[in-house]
């Protein structure tokens, strides 16, 4: 057992495949519940434009519930906005892009002083505020929208999907331009004090693209991020990414955050090539389940081999704080399974599933 670690050291060790004292509840998905926003006096859309309010809201889940991460930047549209897209601020929580900004990839440009452009200074200011406030003790894991999603925003999602079939050269050019921008912004986040970058690429979901499309168009961009940004990274892709896993593990990114893939299956396919983060359901379990159910599901994730426990996506506004606290408590109270290799882990999972059925989900919170 490793001696007691700080949240930052624990999260970094887990992301990079090292030893930890317990599986960290370092959730980089959005935790902006109504209760947390009221407690820290944050509101939409102000939290998108004020560095201190952004920092307060990013850290609220740690201060109130013990979740060991702070994630500034709350929307995946900021990058597209900087590149010229308009946003729908009638939906102020996570404003969507209203439409594409470019038809020609050669026209994609951004200002030289990126740190002074759009809402980027707000995010960088929040990172700096959090770094000073916690003296490096709390991992700062800002959102960074990944290239394929950014390309879809600035060129049109339907256009990008069509071009991967009809004009692959144009699709590649837009992705390359988006990657150049994301690398530049990611380097700024790291320079201002981010410990880990959270790469969100929802448009790379297998519900939208095939595994072959991921391999040809998305994987090269992910490899560039891993190579060119000197900061640990977590990649998140929504939906059922099971068919993408054989390629995702070739990306060079440190950790994969998954949605609906079973934990044991993700561990089996990924092996030890990456750390994995997942996966508490946010549709029913987190908003509607009991703390005991959340606790038990967290234990299952740990026993099935996840390196970090987090939610499958951002939690809904009505998620009870007691459910967030139960998830943290389960991480701290569940011993880490020790296995010499992944194959042995999978065999043990089979035994564990049978035992769960017999003992009514691991004996609940009495263990």
UniProtKB/Swiss-Prot annotation:
It is an enzyme of class 2 (transferase). Pfam families: URO-D. One of its GO terms (biological process) is methylation. It catalyses: methanethiol + coenzyme M = methyl-coenzyme M + hydrogen sulfide + H(+). It comes from the Archaea. Keywords: Metal-binding, Methanogenesis, Methyltransferase, Transferase, Zinc. The keyword Metal-binding applies. Binds 1 zinc ion per subunit. Its EC number is 2.1.1.251. One of its GO terms (molecular function) is uroporphyrinogen decarboxylase activity. Belongs to the uroporphyrinogen decarboxylase family. Homodimer. Methyltransferase involved in methanogenesis from methylated-thiols. Catalyzes two successive steps: mediates the transfer of a methyl group from the substrate to the cobalt cofactor of a methylated-thiol-specific corrinoid protein (MtsB), and the subsequent transfer of the methyl group from the corrinoid protein to coenzyme M. This is Methylated-thiol--coenzyme M methyltransferase. The gene is mtsA.
């Amino acid at each position: 057992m490793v001696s007691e670690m700080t949240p930052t050291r624990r999260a970094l060790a887990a992301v990079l495949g090292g030893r930890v004292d317990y599986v960290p509840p370092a959730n980089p998905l959005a935790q902006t519940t109504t209760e947390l926003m009221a407690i820290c006096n944050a509101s939409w859309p102000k939290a998108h434009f004020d560095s201190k309010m952004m920092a307060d809201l990013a850290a609220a889940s740690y201060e109130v519930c013990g979740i060991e991460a702070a994630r500034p930047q709350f929307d995946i549209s900021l990058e597209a906005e900087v590149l010229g897209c308009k946003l729908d601020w009638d939906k102020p929580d996570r404003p969507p892009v209203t439409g594409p900004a470019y038809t020609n990839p050669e026209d994609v440009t951004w200002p030289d002083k990126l740190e002074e452009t759009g809402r980027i200074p707000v995010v960088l200011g929040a990172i700096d505020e959090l770094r000073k406030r916690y003296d490096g003790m709390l991992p700062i894991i800002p959102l960074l929208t990944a290239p394929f999603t950014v390309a879809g925003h600035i060129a049109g999602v339907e256009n990008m999907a069509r071009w991967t079939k009809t004009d692959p050269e144009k699709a590649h050019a837009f992705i390359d331009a988006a990657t150049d921008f994301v690398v530049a912004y990611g380097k700024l986040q790291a320079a201002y004090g981010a410990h880990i970058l959270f790469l969100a690429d929802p448009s790379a979901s297998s519900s939208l693209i095939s595994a072959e499309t991921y391999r040809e168009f998305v994987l090269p961009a992910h490899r560039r991020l891993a190579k060119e940004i000197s900061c640990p990274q977590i990649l998140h892709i929504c939906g059922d990414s099971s068919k993408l896993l054989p390629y995702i593990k070739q990306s060079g990114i440190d950790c994969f955050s998954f949605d609906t893939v079973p934990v044991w299956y993700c561990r089996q396919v990924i092996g030890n090539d990456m750390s994995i983060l997942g996966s508490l359901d946010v549709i029913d379990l987190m908003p509607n389940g009991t703390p005991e159910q959340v606790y038990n599901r967290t234990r299952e994730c740990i026993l099935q081999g996840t390196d970090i426990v987090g939610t499958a996506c951002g939690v809904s506004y009505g998620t009870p704080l007691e459910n967030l606290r139960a998830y943290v408590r389960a991480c701290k109270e569940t011993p880490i399974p020790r296995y010499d290799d992944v194959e042995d882990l999978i065999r043990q999972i089979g035994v564990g599933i049978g035992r769960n059925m017999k003992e009514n989900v691991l004996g609940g919170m009495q263990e």
